[in-house]
Amino acid sequence: MANIKSQKKRILTNEKARLRNNAVKSELKTAIRAVNTAVESTDKDAAAAALVAASRKLDKAVSKGVLHKNNAANRKSAISKKVNAL
């Protein structure tokens, strides 16, 4: 355990950030899973709607600093290819 006051504060803020980041990543996985299930069921409308929602969540994660912009771009590209293949 840290003895320095600023380090004690950093431990608390890092834990808050870790929990927040894990929650955002979990939402992303759920959104991408929704796109994949819609693609598997060959439902174009549901897949398109899920793609929009997932893209929005990926962009939000980038703006919050949870994901790198290239990582989000790769994920969006992958799910877009699946939806466009329908």
UniProtKB/Swiss-Prot annotation:
<dbReference type="GO" id="GO:0003735">
    <property type="term" value="F:structural constituent of ribosome"/>
</dbReference>
<comment type="function">
    <text>Binds directly to 16S ribosomal RNA.</text>
</comment>
<keyword id="KW-0694">RNA-binding</keyword>
<keyword id="KW-0687">Ribonucleoprotein</keyword>
<dbReference type="GO" id="GO:0006412">
    <property type="term" value="P:translation"/>
</dbReference>
<comment type="similarity">
    <text>Belongs to the bacterial ribosomal protein bS20 family.</text>
</comment>
<dbReference type="InterPro" id="IPR036510">
    <property type="entry name" value="Ribosomal_bS20_sf"/>
</dbReference>
<dbReference type="Pfam" id="PF01649">
    <property type="entry name" value="Ribosomal_S20p"/>
</dbReference>
<dbReference type="GO" id="GO:0015935">
    <property type="term" value="C:small ribosomal subunit"/>
</dbReference>
<dbReference type="InterPro" id="IPR002583">
    <property type="entry name" value="Ribosomal_bS20"/>
</dbReference>
<keyword id="KW-0689">Ribosomal protein</keyword>
<dbReference type="GO" id="GO:0005829">
    <property type="term" value="C:cytosol"/>
</dbReference>
<keyword id="KW-0699">rRNA-binding</keyword>
<protein>
    <recommendedName>
        <fullName>Small ribosomal subunit protein bS20</fullName>
    </recommendedName>
</protein>
<dbReference type="GO" id="GO:0070181">
    <property type="term" value="F:small ribosomal subunit rRNA binding"/>
</dbReference>
